[in-house]
Amino acid sequence: MKRLILLASALLALPVLAAPPVPVSWSLAGQWRAHDGNDPAFEGWRGTDTHWRKLRVPANWYSAGWDHQGALWYRTEFSLPQPAADTLATLEFDGVDYFADVWLNGKRQAKHEGYFQRFAIDITGDLTRYNRLAVRVDSPFEDPKTIWPLHKKQVKGILNQHDSRPGGAWSPQGQDANSGGIWAPVRLRLSRAVAIDNLILRPDWSQGLDKPTLSAELVYRAPADVQTTLTLTAAPDNFTGTRYQQAFPMNLKATGDTPQRVAVSLPMPDAKLWWPVGYGFPHLYQVTATLRDDAGVLDRRRSRTGLRQVIEQPDNKGWTVNGTRVFIRGTNYIGSPWLSTMTARRYARDFALVEEMNANAIRVHGHVANRSLYQQADERGLMIWQDVPLQWGYDDSDAFADNAARQSREMVAQFGNSPSIVVWGGQNEPPFNSPWMEKRFPDWHKDLNRVLMQRVADALAEDKTRIVHAYSAVEEHYWAGWYFGTLQNLLEPAKTAIITEFGAQALPKLSTLKTIIPRKDWWPASTEPGDPKWTSWKYHNFQPIQTFKNAGLSRGNSMASFIHNTQQYQADLVALAAESYRRQRYQPVTALFQFMFVETWPSINWGVVDYLRQPKAGYYALQRAYQPLLPSIDPVNVQWKADQPGQIHLWIVNDQPSGLSGARLAWRVKQGGKLLEQGEQPVTIPADSGNKIVSLPVTPEGTQPLQVESRILDAAGKTVADNRLRIDVLPR
């Protein structure tokens, strides 16, 4: 039976489709048909729909209910009247994971590789009144013995290998729950004589912050030369203000099979700037590029952007946005390993929690997300460190390096209009920088993926409007207290200006945990990682070795105590680390990113928010430690001894662009019910500063924990920031 998508019912009454007064676009979302495509002899572009099943588009096939590895054929039909002679028909895919082989009416149209890119296909010559569209989508299972995980061949980052996805990073099940599919919108676009495939926007600050120029590049296709006028308009999107517009007469050259580019510049004197959260309003402009001839509109493309200047100052002096220094209080973020499940509303929910935690930035860790993420961050003023989707090891060939560099350029071109993206980050923990891999992989060598890293970094560096971080090095991952060392190490001087990972695991609340671990595996007989009941826990990302051996945690006698112990440890660690590195602001620390913000599936990992979006104790600890104005407490040592004197240093750290005069710092130190120390001191707090205010000599009496409280009061006596710390005391 024919299944027809009605693109525009009003048009079906016409014998031909007249050239539209404006470009038109129709979504092809809905119930498509799908069939296993792993048999290479099966030609899914033809034949009947017998034995095909319904599958929703857009969706990752796993989230749509089909747990599948490898290839699927997708098919749908749609109808429309025969277009007019000068009409260009474009099929646009916003994201197909991972390989796409596209057929229309029995003819192969194009192949594409890459899960996150929008790609356009000219189908003008093959479009008819009744059309059958077929797509073979292949998200390959990579052989664990020869390819995965050290020599991966897909640029998918955390989507096909990571500690936080089903099965974990290194187990044979680490590729479970494949993310493949037509996961982002598909549409048919009709234009006249020319098609605009992309509008690339970048700010030019050569005339100063008060006289920005918007540089615009159109990526277009035209079968013949076109005499046209390009009108570029930048109108306020989320505020009321000046609208900027300019017309550019031009002759667009015929492109053939390769899209071409044309560049123009729009002066925007006194334009409103995009500011990050805590520093101002994130002004956004809706930019429209319209091509016209004497008969009307040929094509139009819109994109939203904001004007902001980002600079990484030398010598660890910090990052500036629009000339103002900004200290980065960040967190690593993955919304879901199945990107189609993350809607604008869900990103807004997550980012509200991020902001309430007092973070001003996220690191989109090891993947490119769906476009709603960047739209939400743009609107909220939430800064983004955007990684390329390269996690650990890959094919070391020149061909793969070229492929990864190409995809990195496409990321920059397609997502670079978002002002929230302030950093392009390269490969995460590349093998040449990960000597620990030598013990795990016999074929590891000290230069593995060094060329890949450099080619990707060079591709990212072509964007001169952002900070580029060539790769996320293991030296920037401060895992003391979890993978090595102790909490005490977190109080030591930092060795890098940028800290892109720190944290610890914690169990979620009991009601959430019950949805993750089967009842039969609820309580393993021992804490030894070889106990078979830990297998289910490890599949859901829990790390018994790090929990019980490295961190030295106890389960206690109940699940309630187990949850409490892990959450308390995570809370202590993230707060201790965050405060320590904030006290080291610009000496040398300029940016820090806790790992991770949220658990992405029914998992037990490093998230301070569980997969049901219920905060753990670590969330509230980080919320205190990330206060823009922070009365920080430095215990000097994490464990004290009874009856031995120690020192507590009280600091004020102010990330805000404004200071506070006439303030007071007040404190008290208690042990049990006894007050050991109390006082206050007048302070003037400079903007963008961090200073040690007072050192307190304290001698604990017995082994009860010390409770330290510190708060900042304004000139009216109102508490504007407060903090607390528990210090464990050991017997002498």
Show the residue positions of the predicted features.
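Secreted/periplasmic carbohydrate-active enzymes, especially glycoside hydrolases
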Residues: M1-K2, L6, L17-V364, L573, ...
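N-terminal signal peptide c-region/cleavage motif recognized by signal peptidases
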Residues: A13-P15
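Substrate-binding clefts and catalytic carboxylate motifs of secreted carbohydrate-active enzymes
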Residues: V24-S27, W32-F42, G167, G174-G181, ...
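Short, solvent-exposed loop/turn segments at secondary-structure junctions
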Residues: D97-Y98, P140, P431, E475-E476, ...
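Active-site mouth of glycoside hydrolases
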Residues: F119-I123, R132, E142-T146, K152-N160, ...
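Alpha-helical structural signal in soluble globular domains
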Residues: T290-R292, Q376-L382, Q414, R455-D463, ...
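Active-site proximal loops enriched in glycine and acidic residues that flank catalytic Cys/His/Asp
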Residues: G366, Q386-V388, G425-N428, A470-S472, ...
